[in-house]
C-alpha cells in the first residue's frame, strides 16, 4: 500500500513539472522580440573578483632609525697585555783556543793605515808621534797584518841592513798610552826584522820603543815632561828632553849599534822619518791576539798585555 502511494505521488510530481516547463517555453517564444534583461547575480564570482582586484595603496611608512645598541657607548674592552717573549740567551762565544802563529816573509807584511784620531788619547798620540833616524842596521817594518799574520824576520847574515832597507808596503809605528802616577805615558814601538851589528852577530827580530811622558793629554797645550828611549832591556832618560832633541812636539831618536853591541835607541838632534801610527785599541782582533801570543825569539814586544805595564814601571823617569 505504501509502495502504491509513493508511485502515485511521483507520477503527480512529474506531471506538475512538465506543465511548468511547457508554460515557460511558451512565454519565451512570445517575448523573443524584446531583449531579455541580464539578471542580477545574487552571488559574487570569486575568480572574477580576484582578476579585477584593485591593488591596495601602500601607505607611506617612515622607517624609524634603528635603536642604537647601548653597548656601543661602553668603552671597548682593552686588548690583553702580554709579557714580551724573552729573547733567547745567546750561546756563549766559543773559546777560539790558543793562537797559532802565522808567519810570513818580512817584506810581505802590510801595515795598518793611520786612522783619523777620534779620542783624546789618539789625538795626543798623533800630536807627539816621534821621528826615528836610522844610523845603521835595519829600517822599521810592519810586524803584523790585519789578519794576524806576523813577520818571519831575517837571519843574522850579511850587512846590518842587508834585506831590510825599507818595506815597499810602508812602515809602521805602534802606540799605546795610559796614566802612570798622574803622568800620561805614550809608548811608541818599532819592529825590525833583525838586530845584527854584523854577520853572525845579534838575533832574528828586534823591538825598540820610546816613551814620551806628558802632563795631560786633555789640555790645549800638553807639555813634554820626559823622554825614555829603550836600550838593551833598559832605558836612557831625559828629564826634560833637550830642546835640540825635539822638533815641535815630535821627539827625535836614532837607531844605532855600537859594534859589537846590538842596536838600541838614543835621543838625537838628527831628524828622522815618521811612520803610520796605529794604536793598540785600533788593531784588529786577530792582530791583538797575535801580538799577545807570538814569541819573537830574543826580542820582546813591549806594548802587549804581558809587558806593557812592567815596561812603564821600569822606565819611570821621575
Swiss-Prot record:
Pfam families noted in UniProt: NPP1
Coiled-coil parts of chain: none
Positions with biased composition (Polar residues): 55-65
Segments carrying motif Conserved undecapeptide motif I: 185-195
Annotated Low complexity bias: 23-41
Region (Disordered): 23-42, 51-96
GO cellular component assignments: extracellular region
Entry-listed glycosylation sites: 60
Domain notes: Key residues/motif important for the effector activities are degenerated in most NLPs, including the nlp24 peptide consisting of the conserved region I (11-aa immunogenic part) and conserved region II (the heptapeptide GHRHDWE motif) that is important for phytotoxic activity.
Name assigned to this protein: NLP effector protein 7
Gene: NLP7
